[in-house]
Amino acid sequence: MYCFLFLQKDTFFHEQFLARRRHAEVGPLRSAACRRRPGDLGFTVFSLLSLHTDRVAGAVRNHRRLSFFDDYGNTKSYLGAYTSKIGVLVVVCGFYFFLYLSMTVFLFFVLIII
C-alpha cells in the first residue's frame, strides 16, 4: 500500500512539473492565438494545433531525458510517473474482471440450483 501511495505522489509531482513547464513554453503561442478573434475558425484551429504541438514536443523531450529535478532538488523519474498510471489501470481493470467473473459464477450456480 505504501508503494502505491508513493507512486501516486510521484505522479502528482510529475504533473505539476509538466504543467509549470507547459505554461512557461506555451505562453507566446497562446498570446499569439489570443490576438485572433474567438469566433474565427482560424482561432480554433490555431489554438488546437499549438496545444497539440506543445504536447508532442513535450513527449519527445521527456523520452529523451528520463529524469528531472523537482522543486526540492530530488531526482524524479518520468518512467515512474507513467508506470504508476499503468498500475492504477491494471488494478481497476482487475477489479472489474473479478466482479464480472464472480457474478458469472454466481449466476451459473443459481441457474443450476433452480
Swiss-Prot record:
Organism of provenance: Human cytomegalovirus (strain AD169)
Domain of life of the organism encoding this protein: Viruses
Protein name as catalogued: Uncharacterized protein IRL3
